[in-house]
Amino acid sequence: LAAVSVDCSEYPKPTCTMEYRPLCGSDNKTYGNKCNFCNAVVESNGTLTLSHFGKC
């Protein structure tokens, strides 16, 4: 099984769009899109990872 990952190098960003493309984080929380997820990754100091694409 290939590891899924998202490039968060351009984050954090001050604002995210309302686009809905859900991602499931390793904290078992569904993030609305990559921007919301990546901002959370940055805030977690890299401890948050992507579990899978789609809702948890």
Swiss-Prot record:
Annotated Pfam families: Kazal_1
SMART domains, A to Z: KAZAL
Main subcellular localisation: secreted
Glycosylation sites: N45
GO molecular function, one term: serine-type endopeptidase inhibitor activity
Subcellular location: Secreted
Domain Kazal-like residue range list: 6-56
Intrachain S-S bonds: C8-C38, C16-C35, C24-C56
Site-annotated residues for Reactive bond 3: M18, E19
InterPro entries linked to this entry: Bifunctional_prot_inhibitor (IPR051597), Kazal_dom (IPR002350), Kazal_dom_sf (IPR036058), Prot_inh_Kazal-m (IPR001239)
GO cellular component: extracellular space
Keywords for the protein's UniProt record, in alphabetical order: Disulfide bond, Glycoprotein, Protease inhibitor, Repeat, Secreted, Serine protease inhibitor
Domain topic, free-text comment: Avian ovomucoid consists of three homologous, tandem Kazal family inhibitory domains.
Protein name stated in the entry: Ovomucoid
Organism: Lophura bulweri
Taxonomic lineage of the native organism: Eukaryota, Metazoa, Chordata, Craniata, Vertebrata
